[in-house]
């Protein structure tokens, strides 16, 4: 199924039910002020009217807590490790926003870099998880994907992109897996190929909605002109030494809301937990906002105050990750940290402050920088 | 601009111009609807950015303790009590603190507003008297302030600041009018198993970002017990025992000190009703020991007082 198909919106639950054969299907569900991915239940139906999920879907591929292996400390098995079986079930996430899909594509480059460093847990879950995106027609006030190499109808990281056209839904395949999935959909409901006059009209409507969504961000006081260009021209040391950081960090509470709700933050901590004669090695999300994150065994802490920790988060997103990823920002512009930060520290304002300060900073040193994370 | 904001600016500009303080801690407009941002104004010009809305839901006493210098702080009833707390706990000297007293009509709950909008995006909120007008691209809806107030503000017992070096407005009725003991009935009528079930369910969605801890003006340990690594007192996982232990210990650290300011609940990204635990502590301190936290600089903290006829119910 190479071409896009148009379905009646009323057929979406039927399609999801069909996709659910042999897979767990998750959809965004809103309860009160929170929206979260939940198992699709045809009886509860679904809504395509949600901004984005409160938390990012990253925990589907990178769980907050994950057992990596088990070991024994006593007896004949002492010192032996057994890797935890990789048992990722087949899943399909419907309604992933393009920003979050872009984050998955970005994290692929962190967790699956080469044969020697592939993270098998991420890779297997990624392989067994199909992503059907839902294009954004009405971005939130906090959205800025267009400034972060993304767009409200972008397809990076997705298998299919769905676009809500009101009474109809346009499904566009992105990958081979997406094409196979679209064929399944066409068996469950009647899909009209998006060609000819009717198809042209639907594609035109989708295009209008894309432009409308982009216009919303273009009208925002925070998005136009947002660029990493000056930051990229300056050395790491220059950006590091900018005078802006204490003021930005001043009202930060140093909680982990920004990092834990962020779709691209991926730092973790590995711990061995032992009880009696056995134990497990477990990986948990960690946050650079925490004092403990960089505490050395010696007692020294290279990031002793919140100023260094806050700087680290923005340096990672806007300097280190672009250095490692050929210029791609480490942020996808989903706006969650803007929405959720208890102190309303707005990453868009921070980037703008970095940009302005980089423009007027004295020339960078000639010593080349090495990217770090 | 509302009268409160205008008056706060006047006071802050005067304090800074006369060099009576080095900085004024208050709020400025948020970057998105239904938000206000903590802000440290250091010049009269910066003080012109200060504002006051129903979305000043953090607790500035949290930031006041770490800023240094002579500081003026905009404080509602609860925040003024927490300022008493940080003075009592020697985290800030009274002579370095100027309280800009803000009689409080109760702060608003952005989640309640979002819930009532059922999916429609909010672009602005206007507050006039007892009315809150919520606007969007193609709608405008008016609510009574009580309908969208935070729960803790509905049952507030002390809306007027207990310290007042500068005053923003005339006093308001002292209480929010609601029944503060209602919330703990949730626990009291339940058998232990059902209590534990409710406790478990309440914190099920916790992501351990510690926003509740970090928003709280009571926390003062140099190294929080959850960050202790030698020995490590608490596991890092999302497993129930780790999550529940964190919440239980955090709550106990607030015993006799919690002012029910609601900052923890407002900060939680998962929408967890944090006050279910802390309100029980507040209630025990008040009903069993006749103690309300930090009402004056002279009152002794509940945990610093022992009397042979103290009730024992607290252990049951």
Name these PLM-found stretches.
Chain A
Residues 248-259:
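Extended amphipathic alpha-helical segments enriched in small hydrophobics
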Residues 225-250, 268-373:
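Ferredoxin-type iron-sulfur electron-transfer modules in oxidoreductases and energy-metabolism complexes
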